Amino acid sequence: MSNTTMATSTILLFLLAGLAAAHGDGDTTIRLPSDGAKASRPRAAKPWDCCDNIEISRLMIYPPLYRCNDEVKQCAAACKECVEAPGGDFNGGAFVCSDWFSTVDPGPKCTAALDGLSMERPWKCCDNIKRLPTKPDPPQWRCNDELEPSQCTAACKSCREAPGPFPGKLICEDIYWGADPGPFCTPRPWGDCCDKAFCNKMNPPTCRCMDEVKECADACKDCQRVESSEPPRYVCKDRFTGHPGPVCKPRAEN
């Protein structure tokens, strides 16, 4: 065999070996994510930790959109669009996070939150109660009900504009520090709490509660038994326009 023939055979041998390696073991199975992989995207972090100059979008959606217009030395890590503020207050420049964020509660103020802190509850009742993401004991609460201007200014030290046409209703900015945030103003058909609330994106939202309970609340008009439940469990099929209320604590007692 000539040297040319041997060289050609060697090259063909290497090419065939490379093709075999590229094809692998012949397994053409499409690999799906493992059972432990997360199927849903993680909840986005708020682009600010606190905010004094909060802006509410005029879009009538729920949860509403907020933007923080505070000028800061450095934007929060979660901020995606951090822009330089013209004529900033800080030496070396100031920045503003221009992100819009969808949330029920935009969070506490940075410098004035303690001004509205009270050990006495500013409201007699509240439909849209919000527990603040702080860790004191007792907890801190804010009522996000939309009130007539005269109601808000009479009961609260600080009020802010509610989403919607201007001028319009106001929301109390005061923070209550106590164990009991008070009763609802409008009774929910399912009672004071709900673990499985489903709401649309309107503002205010229309909600229903799919909790299976021993008995429906007195305010429920359409109480239906869960099929094949033993002992019997019930679900209130009523719909309610407004905040669904807090989750039930502890869940095991539902």
Swiss-Prot record:
The organism's place on the tree of life at top rank: Eukaryota
GO cellular component: extracellular region
Prosegment residue ranges: 23-118, 252-254
Signal peptide annotation: 1-22
Organism of derivation: Oryza sativa subsp. japonica
Gene label: RBBI3.3
Disulfide-linked positions: 125-185, 126-143, 152-159, 156-172, 193-248, 194-209, 199-207, 216-223, 220-236
Family according to the record: Belongs to the Bowman-Birk serine protease inhibitor family.
UniProt keyword annotation of Repeat present: yes
Site (Reactive bond for trypsin): 135-136, 201-202
UniProt-recorded name of the protein: Bowman-Birk type bran trypsin inhibitor
InterPro entries: Bowman-Birk_prot_inh, Prot_inh_BBI
Gene Ontology molecular function terms on file: serine-type endopeptidase inhibitor activity
Keyword check for Signal: yes
Keyword tags: Disulfide bond, Protease inhibitor, Repeat, Serine protease inhibitor, Signal
Matching CDD domains: BBI (cd00023)
Residue windows of the Sequence repeats: 46-120, 121-187, 188-251
